[in-house]
UniProtKB/Swiss-Prot annotation:
Gene giving rise to this polypeptide: fabI
NCBIfam families in the record: PRK07370.1
Subunit structure: Homotetramer.
Claim: Lipid metabolism is one of the keywords in the record: yes
Alphabetical keyword list: Fatty acid biosynthesis, Fatty acid metabolism, Lipid biosynthesis, Lipid metabolism, NAD, Oxidoreductase
Transmembrane segments: none
Cross-referenced Pfam families: adh_short_C2
Residues where NAD(+) binds: 13, 19-20, 67-68, 95, 165, 194-198
Signal sequence extent: none
Biological process (GO), any one: fatty acid elongation
Name of the protein described by the UniProt record: Enoyl-[acyl-carrier-protein] reductase [NADH] FabI
Annotated positions binding substrate: 98
Length: 258
């Protein structure tokens, strides 16, 4: 049985109860982890209120604002972790964004600003958060991010996000190579399409889900909690020999030729 008792885990990217990050947070909590949750701050406090109410049953010991495009907020987040916890064991990176206009139509029409924004939030944030977490993972650790098949195959309308996920998976390998000597493992979970706030921006997402339900060996898509189970496994000592990998949790869709 998975046991994360005594482990400190920071979970990023929870927006609502359909977020994959929410499924991961629930399973880490069920395994006994001590949770810290970040939220995206906004002027009206909309996300803070919504996420705070959602995660309250998990009793997180830290609840922090963190916009990954704001270097000061990132530093403040990890300073607080150091001061309150002293150590970080698990980092969950569930952050992705691209402008809606760049997730439909022709990829060649992606704007320069849209391309930069997608890679900054979806890819570089993993590098930056991992760098901030590194000195706090004094007893080793596990860093886990979320990818998608569109990072290795051309998926209609996924466009610039596919490029961002390809960069994310490469970043996993480079971070795993760098951090392995400190017993810090870095892995990605490539989940099948799930209806989330982020995926709703992708043109034709419902068609993608229906296609997976028809073609995947299990004849269904996966749930947030199934992804959460995999994350809890990767965060645990049961996965102590796994790093630099992309694990597909997609009902088997990735293996199909057509």
């Amino acid at each position: 049985m998975l046991n994360l008792t005594g482990k400190n885990a920071l979970v990023t990217g929870i927006a609502n109860n359909r977020s994959i990050a929410w499924g991961i947070a629930q399973q880490l909590h069920a395994a006994g982890a001590n949770l810290g949750i970040t939220y995206l701050p906004d002027e009206r406090g909309k996300f803070e209120k919504k996420v705070s109410e959602l995660v309250e049953p998990l009793n997180p010991s830290l609840f922090l604002p963190c916009n990954v495009q704001n270097d000061e907020q990132i530093q403040s987040t990890f300073d607080t972790i150091r001061d309150k916890w002293g150590r970080l064991d698990i980092l969950i990176h569930c952050l992705a964004f691209a402008n809606r206009d760049d997730l439909t139509g022709d990829f060649s029409q992606t704007s320069r600003a849209g391309f930069a924004t997608a890679l900054d939030i979806s890819t570089f944030s993993l590098v930056q958060l991992s760098g901030a977490a590194k000195p706090l993972m004094t007893e080793g650790g596990s860093i886990i991010t979320l990818s998608y098949l569109g990072g290795v195959r051309a998926v209609p309308n996924y466009n610039v996000m596919g490029v961002a996920k390809a960069g994310l998976e490469a970043s996993v390998r480079y971070l795993a190579s760098e951090l392995g000597s400190q017993n810090i493992r870095v892995n990605a979970i490539s989940a099948g399409p799930i209806r989330t706030l982020a995926s709703s921006a992708v043109g034709g997402i419902l068609d993608m889900i229906h296609h997976v339900e028809q073609v995947a060996p299990l004849r269904r898509t996966v749930t947030q909690l199934e992804v959460g189970n995999t994350a809890a496994f990767l965060a645990s000592d049961l996965a102590s020999g796994i790093t630099g990998q992309v694990l597909y949790v997609d009902a088997g869709y990735e293996i199909m030729g057509m």
